[in-house]
């Protein structure tokens, strides 16, 4: 034992003189494990970088092909040889800039990939091929030396145990072998560990350098791309300026087209209801330089306003509900109302997943943009119920204030969530909700009523559309009922509230407190079972806003033609006084007589007629505006016995035959309405006659000549007789009146049927012309 201790001490001294001692041997485990890990990581990283490099090479080639295609595409928009192909020069130039930029950037990417391959991949490949092998050789030498040391040490231990039975020489020989193995193992271990350490250090330094160079390569790549983008910025600004001019030209063209295309389908469109024509206003007693417009012209003005391009702001999405309704003069935004009516159709309300299935997002976006721009005001040509339901949800979602408002959120939710306060009674809860809904603004309430009515009807078809009240509430509630600060709990409460409102639609909206709120014209239909939404296809009174009928035209006076048969006039009455003769004539076929003393007025006189025995529907003491179109005059014409002057646009009409001769001064103030023309056998203008033109000299009735016609007051009950268009022109040179040639068949009486007997004596119609007007009468060609 004493010798062993001495030998062990000598070995320690020998090992202590070396640079690397046995105390570093525990590092062997750490370093060998590090080398194994580095070998695995290096192999994986090498494969990834190689794959990345190949992928980038393919990307570079594809991007270069893309740049070439863009350059070719730019040539389609401009051709310097043929000016007719210059579709859009700014677009062609921009495509050219983009194509060249992509090509340059891909060249930079090519350089970037080469730098990575040369530095990082080369370093990793070198480590895998040489350094890893050197490390493995050092490890093998270390293991071999350790085995020799372990064998010598074990042999020495065995001899020591048997030292009493063996010679001392064998023990000394074993001790020398152990000393040699220990020295050899110490040298190999020091050398192997040093080699491993050098390999690890080299890998770390080279990897750091490769990673740093990669970052610099990325920096150079992006810097070159940025520099190139900045270099083309000036050219891009020039093309932007040219494109702005191009857009301005497009806007001008669009305005010209829109004035023709907009509201092209006037007869079939249900967008705007035409108002009825305004009643004729009574003329003032004072002279007016501009006459009142005729009813026909007012109709034309209304039609022009209807087909005109909508001006001002037509935006619907993102606008306040009150702003839209005030702008459109409606209770509910028109396009939303039409959408609800569309969804109420049987084929749409039974669509599976209505209000849940999403449509084509591009179609929805295009529809919203066109509605905001005012290009679409109807749903003609749209048959996708999912598109329209999503359109309605998008409108509700983009409202700046939700449909049920922020202020009423907690009030509505509390009615349903705190149902214990109402003993869980649906009727009491519904009444509480009714009290809250009364506080809604008018547009919000009416739209909510129509919307909930639609949802209730959809829920009744849940067996077909798979949309129960719960499903509908989940899809609609987040768009119509939410607080200012959203959270999960508020959404859950809103879903429960909307589900209750849909389920109890009849109890809520048929409540007496709000059933007639705001006098909603599109009330809930459906009778005792509740009803659908406003004006739906299920029943109820049609909303006048959806009327497609144009305003009724003013009634045209009925023309009366005397046929070639004698009038049924009592013979005895013709021999009586002039008043009784006039009365019997009026009761048979002639109009009521004109008063002998009409009110006198220098301009726009008012004539009052009283005819208690007339068969027409003329009210007594009817005031008539003589400035309106002669077709709408309420006074019957009569033959004038003398020349009279008038300030109206029409020629004078004669008095009834039974009337006595009227002084010229009084008749100058009479304003006639209808011209009686085609007179035969003209006589002196100053000659008067008291002979009844409808009777012979013996007092018996006689037929009427072919050249006489007159208007009776229109009773607005009969249909006007078809008329031919006579060739007759009346020109008025008065510059202060709105006269025009009577070329329309509505302005002339129909021709008379031919008769055999001529009229005996009728005076021609003449008129005293003032200095400001001249009226010329051309004969009517009755051929």
From Swiss-Prot:
Pfam families: BAR_3, RhoGAP. Keywords: Coiled coil, Cytoplasm, GTPase activation. GO terms for molecular function: GTPase activator activity. Residues 138-188 form a coiled coil. GO terms for cellular component: cytoplasm. Residues 262-299, 527-745 are annotated as: Disordered. Residues 283-299, 568-589, 599-630, 641-651, 661-698 have a biased composition (Low complexity). The record marks 356 as: Arginine finger. Residues 706-738 have a biased composition (Polar residues). Residues 527-539 have a biased composition (Gly residues). Gene3D superfamilies: Arfaptin homology (AH) domain/BAR domain, Rho GTPase activation protein. The keyword Nuclease does not apply. It is found in: Cytoplasm. One of its GO terms (biological process) is small GTPase-mediated signal transduction. Residues 319-509 form the Rho-GAP domain. SUPFAM superfamilies: BAR/IMD domain-like (SSF103657), GTPase activation domain, GAP (SSF48350). Rho GTPase-activating protein involved in the signal transduction pathway. This is Rho GTPase-activating protein gacR.
């Amino acid at each position: 034992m004493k010798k062993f201790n001495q030998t062990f001490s000598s070995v320690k001294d020998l090992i202590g003189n070396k640079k690397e001692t046995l105390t570093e041997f525990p590092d062997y485990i750490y370093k060998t494990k590090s080398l194994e890990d580095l070998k695995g990581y290096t192999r994986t990283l090498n494969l990834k970088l190689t794959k990345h490099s190949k992928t980038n090479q393919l990307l570079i080639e594809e991007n270069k092909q893309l740049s070439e295609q863009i350059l070719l595409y730019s040539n389609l928009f401009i051709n310097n040889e043929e000016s007719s192909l210059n579709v859009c020069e700014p677009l062609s130039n921009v495509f050219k800039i983009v194509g060249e930029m992509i090509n340059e950037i891909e060249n930079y990417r090519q350089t970037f990939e080469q730098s990575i391959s040369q530095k990082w991949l080369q370093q990793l490949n070198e480590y895998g091929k040489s350094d890893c092998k050197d490390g493995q050789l050092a490890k093998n030498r270390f293991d071999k030396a350790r085995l020799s040391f372990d064998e010598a040490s074990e042999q020495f231990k065995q001899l020591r145990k048997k030292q009493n039975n063996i010679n001392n020489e064998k023990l000394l020989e074993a001790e020398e072998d152990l000393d040699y193995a220990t020295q050899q193992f110490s040298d190999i271990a020091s050398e192997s560990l040093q080699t491993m350490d050098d390999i690890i250090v080299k890998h770390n330094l080279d990897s750091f350098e490769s990673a740093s160079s990669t970052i610099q390569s990325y920096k150079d790549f992006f810097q070159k791309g940025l520099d190139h983008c900045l270099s083309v910025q000036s050219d891009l600004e020039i093309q932007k300026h040219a494109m702005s001019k191009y857009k301005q030209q497009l806007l001008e063209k669009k305005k010209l087209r829109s004035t023709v295309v907009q509201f092209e389908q006037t007869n079939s469109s249900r967008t705007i209801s035409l108002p009825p024509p305004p009643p004729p206003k009574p003329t003032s007693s004072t002279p007016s330089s501009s006459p009142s417009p005729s009813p026909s012209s007012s109709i034309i003005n209304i039609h022009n306003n209807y087909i005109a391009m909508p001006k001002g702001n037509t935006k619907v999405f993102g606008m306040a509900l009150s702003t839209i309704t005030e702008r459109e003069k409606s209770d509910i935004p028109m396009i939303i109302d039409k959408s609800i009516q569309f969804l109420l159709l049987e084929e749409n309300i039974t669509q599976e997943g209505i209000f849940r299935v999403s449509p084509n997002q591009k179609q929805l976006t295009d529809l919203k943009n066109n509605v905001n721009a005012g290009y679409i005001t109807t749903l003609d040509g749209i048959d996708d119920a999912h598109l329209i339901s999503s359109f309605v949800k998008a409108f509700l979602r983009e409202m700046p204030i939700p449909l049920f408002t922020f202020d009423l959120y907690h009030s509505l939710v509390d009615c349903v969530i705190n149902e214990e306060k109402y003993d869980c009674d649906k009727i009491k809860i519904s009444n509480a909700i009714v009290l809250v809904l009364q506080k809604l603004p008018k547009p919000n309430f009416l739209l909510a009523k129509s919307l909930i009515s639609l949802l209730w009807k959809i829920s009744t078809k849940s067996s077909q559309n798979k949309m129960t009240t719960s499903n509908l509430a989940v899809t609609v509630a987040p768009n119509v009922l939410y607080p200012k600060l959203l959270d999960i709990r508020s959404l859950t409460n809103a879903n429960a509230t909307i589900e209750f409102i849909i389920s109890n639609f009849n109890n809520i909206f048929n409540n007496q407190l709000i059933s007639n709120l705001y006098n909603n014209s599109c009330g809930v239909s459906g009778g005792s079972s509740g009803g659908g939404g406003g004006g739906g296809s299920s029943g109820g009174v049609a909303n006048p806003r959806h009327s497609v009928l144009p305003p009724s035209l003013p009634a045209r006076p009925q023309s009366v033609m005397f046929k070639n048969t004698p009038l049924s006039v009592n013979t005895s009455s013709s021999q009586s006084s002039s008043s009784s003769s006039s009365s019997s004539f009026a009761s048979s076929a002639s109009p009521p007589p004109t008063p002998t003393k009409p009110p006198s007025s220098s301009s726009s006189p008012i004539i009052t007629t009283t005819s208690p025995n007339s068969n027409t529907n003329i009210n007594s003491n009817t005031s008539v505006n003589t400035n309106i179109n002669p077709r709408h005059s309420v006074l019957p014409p009569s033959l004038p016995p003398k020349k009279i002057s008038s300030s109206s646009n029409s020629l004078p009409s004669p008095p009834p035959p039974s009337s006595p001769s009227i002084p010229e001064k009084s008749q100058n103030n009479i304003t006639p309405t209808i011209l009686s023309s085609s007179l035969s056998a003209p006589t002196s203008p100053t000659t008067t006659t008291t002979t009844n033109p409808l009777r012979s000299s013996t007092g018996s009735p006689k037929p009427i000549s072919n050249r006489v016609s007159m208007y009776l007051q229109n009773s607005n009950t009969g249909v006007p007789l078809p008329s031919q268009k006579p060739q007759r022109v009346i020109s008025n040179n008065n510059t202060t009146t709105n006269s025009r040639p009577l070329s329309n068949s509505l302005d002339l009486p129909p021709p008379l049927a031919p008769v055999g007997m001529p009229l005996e004596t009728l005076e021609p119609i003449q008129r005293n012309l003032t200095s400001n007007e001249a009226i010329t009468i051309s004969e009517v060609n009755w051929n």
